[in-house]
Structures are given as C-alpha cells and as structure tokens.
Amino acid sequence: MSILPIIKGEYKKDYNLKHLTWFKVGGNAEIFFKPFDFADLKSFLIQNKQKLPITTFGSGSNIIIRDGGIEGVVIKLGQNFNKIEFLDNHLIVGSSCLNYNLARFCQANAISGFEFLVGIPGTIGGGVIMNAGAYGSAFQDIIVQVEALDFSGNFLTFTNKEIGFKYRGNNLPKDLILLKAVFKVNKGDSQNILLKMNKINNTRSSTQPIKERTGGSTFINPEGRKSWELIDKAGLRGYRIGGASISELHCNFMINNGNATAKDLEDLGNFVRQKVFEDSGVELNWEIKRIGKYV
C-alpha cells in the first residue's frame, strides 16, 4: 500500500461494506474514504497521482460487492455532496442526493418531470451513470449537464449530448467522480405531481419486492422484450442457489433470504442467464454492477 494522501476527511482501513449495500453481502474495502468536501476530494486525487486504485460507491442499491472485497480506495461522498440548489431556473443537485429526496423536493416546489425518481433507489450520481429510468422517463430527459473530477483531480463538465446517454448507460469516461448534476426546471401542479408519485409508489409496492434484501432490477430488458417474462418462461420464478433466490413477486429481482453470499447472488444471476439463453435464445445483460475480488 502506498502512502495515503493527507486529507481532512477520514480513512477507515479494512472497512466492511456489507452494511452499506441493499443486498447486505460482500467483503471489505482495503481503504474507505469519505471526503470532507470538494477541496478535500480534489486534494486527495491530486496527491494520489493515480497510484492507488479508486472505486466510487453510492447508496449500494444496484451493486454486488464480491466476498473478497475491494482493493485500493473506496470513495463514498457524504452529506456535503447532497445539496439541492436553485440557480437561473435550473436545479443543481449533489451527486450523493437520493433520487427519492429530489423527487420529494420537486413535489414540494411544484417542479414536474421528476416524479419517476420516487421509484428509483439510489443516488443522483448513480442514476446518471445508469441512465436510470422508469414509467416512461429517464435521466437523459431531465439532465442539462454534470460536473465531475477525473481521477487526476481535473474538474470537468459534460453536457447532456456529451454524456452520450443510452439505454441504462452512457459514454462518459470511466475514471470520473460525479459531483453535481444540473437539471432543467418545468413548473407543474404540486397536487398532480403528488398523485403521480403516489401511483408510482403503489405500483412498485404491489409488483416489486421492495421490503426484501434486493438490489433492484437484475438484468437490462432486451430490445422489445421483458427480462422478467423470459426468466419466468424458463421456469425460474423462485429458483434458489444457497441463500439467494429469484423473487416470486417479480422475476427480474434477486433476493438475499438472510444468509446469501455475494457468490450465491452472482452464481444465481449467471445461472439465470444461461437458462434463459437455452430456453429463448436471448442473452440477458446484467444491470446490477458486480465489483471486487472473488474469494
């Protein structure tokens, strides 16, 4: 391990990440770093000179951390990176702000177009990276630009076009830490916005296992198809490997039944991919990110 950069925030060595993920599985971070503020993060990156490998971490909602943990430094942005501000008819939102919190803020301030965020777990930063979407809307529809630091500490901005949004992804460089997202503002009726959000919440609670240890949608929907239908057709509803299972309620969700390992979940996902391909000839692609070392 190289000498760690001098910081104002805090380091934690051999830090268990399991409790930070929705699946509640996975190994430790070799070094866990929460920057104090923007200047602290920038200083760390400049001092590091890309010597230590860096992994960024959001709310842990759409990720499997493998049981062997993560080498290098895991960076998690905290409360100093979750602010919501108005400026010139735009919203400027910190990347660690939860999607749900932004949806609630917009409802309270009669801003329309953000209703779908109430049903998307995770942070704004993760939502941008995934081009997260639901109910006919996605991040690409509301983003103006993003602000970021690269792993060398250079400050960069990217417009909506430069981000290169695509279905559940983008064309941004991989060595970025997103800091803020700028959104366009369209005024609406607060009560109508609330009704839309309540409808989304009701739909989610009746069709998705939101009270279970899950990580959201497991696979990207193939063009013109639904992953859950393909999984169900392959006879895998409720299928188990170790402590992991396919949800009985929604086949595109995996569940930790209480004692699953990251390996159980990843093995289950790969088994599903194999069986769906054998049954339908369709190759499912992971939506859930898998990172870290195998044991």
Curated annotation (Swiss-Prot):
Organism of this sequence: Rickettsia prowazekii (strain Madrid E)
Keyword DNA-binding recorded: no
Enzyme Commission designation: 1.3.1.98
Its job: Cell wall formation.
Annotated active site: R168, S217 (proton donor), E287
Annotated GO biological process: cell division; cell wall organization; peptidoglycan biosynthetic process; regulation of cell shape
Cofactor names: FAD
Protein name: UDP-N-acetylenolpyruvoylglucosamine reductase
Molecular function GO labels: FAD binding; UDP-N-acetylmuramate dehydrogenase activity
Superkingdom of origin: Bacteria
GO cellular component terms listed in the entry, alphabetical order: cytosol
Keywords assigned by UniProt, alphabetized: Cell cycle, Cell division, Cell shape, Cell wall biogenesis/degradation, Cytoplasm, FAD, Flavoprotein, NADP, Oxidoreductase, Peptidoglycan synthesis
Catalytic activity field: UDP-N-acetyl-alpha-D-muramate + NADP(+) = UDP-N-acetyl-3-O-(1-carboxyvinyl)-alpha-D-glucosamine + NADPH + H(+)
Gene3D superfamilies for the chain: 3.30.465.10, UDP-N-acetylenolpyruvoylglucosamine reductase, C-terminal domain, Uridine Diphospho-n-acetylenolpyruvylglucosamine Reductase, domain 2
InterPro entries membership: FAD-bd_PCMH, FAD-bd_PCMH-like_sf, FAD-bd_PCMH_sub1, FAD-bd_PCMH_sub2, MurB, MurB_C, MurB_C_sf, Oxid_FAD_bind_N
Entry keyword annotation includes Acetylation: no
